[in-house]
Amino acid sequence: MGSFNDFLDAEFRPPRNWSLNAPLKFKSETLTREERELLVECGVQVTKTTSTITVPKGYITDLASVPRVCWAFIAPFDCARAAVVHDIMYEKINGAFKKGIIESKAERETYRKIADDMFLEGMQSAEPSVPVWKQQAAYRAVRAFGRWAINSSAPRKGI
């Protein structure tokens, strides 16, 4: 399992966003050298030696994009830190696709799988722990529905 540098320090920005007051770092234990290189290529801040992904201070996120009707089962706060790391990865992957760094939709799917796997590892590393059934439900949801977010042409707020 990976590890986060700290708890999430963010300020609410109505109507649905949060702004990070401090950088959020996630050190992955499963990211391969090839995956690190792919992420660096598309603009994700990840160290080449320790596989630490950094989300900078000031980053704007919606935490987890969970429909309110599902909050009784998976509230956005259950997987918030993992979701923030996932958000920035999707944003950078989308940007790299638009700039031609990622050349095909099939290649973008490879990057999306890496981001989704980091989301799962982040939930597995969370303190307090996220129950396994919630991890699996959230992971399956991003695998099933994340393609719409990553294929979106709408700009994210980011930094």
Where are these regions (language model features)?
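Extended terminal accessory/targeting regions
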Residues: 1-159
